[in-house]
A protein has these predicted regions:
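DUTPase catalytic domain/fold
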Residues: 1-152
Length: 152
């Protein structure tokens, strides 16, 4: 699959996977800006757009939207930082610079710096759905058992 990428900063690094089996692609920060106390914005230095081939391959004969998601890296715990909206959605029509905003919730821990891998990017497809209001839902094995219902 092909995704068009435009470098907006000469230091931009094209997202990459270390291992073929990796699910997401690592993204490297090219700049940092403190937006508010302990709120940091990291620009990635590029813009993305799904290629026409990718759109046609994925969409096929059904109506769907393509997006990319930014996700925290598994090592984020070492920084005391939290991606501001946990998973950021980048809609197919957005062609601006991709950036990630983090809250530095544990300021005594180190935070990300320029040239660090700060997040991961993933490709997703959203098929159009219609919500249908009903009076009852079909019974399931889990039922209404919520938080913690599967045990430890």
């Amino acid at each position: 699959m092909i995704v068009n990428i435009k470098k907006l900063n000469p230091k931009a690094v094209i997202p990459f996977r270390k291992y073929k089996s990796d699910f997401c692609y690592d993204c490297v920060a090219v700049s940092e800006e403190e937006l508010a106390p302990n709120v940091w914005k990291y620009k990635l230095g590029f813009a993305l757009q799904p290629s026409l081939l990718l759109k046609n391959t994925v969409k096929g004969n059904f109506d769907s939207n393509i997006c990319f998601t930014l996700r925290p890296r598994s090592s984020v715990w070492e920084t005391g930082m939290v991606l501001s909206n946990s998973i950021a959605t980048i809609d197919e029509g957005f062609i601006g610079e991709i950036s990630a905003v983090f809250y530095h919730v544990m300021p005594n821990m180190p935070r990300y710096k320029v040239d660090d891998k700060v997040c991961q990017i993933h490709f997703d497809v959203c098929v159009d759905i219609e919500f249908k209001e009903v009076d009852t839902l079909e019974e399931t094995e889990r039922g209404t058992n919520g938080y913690g219902s599967t045990g430890r």
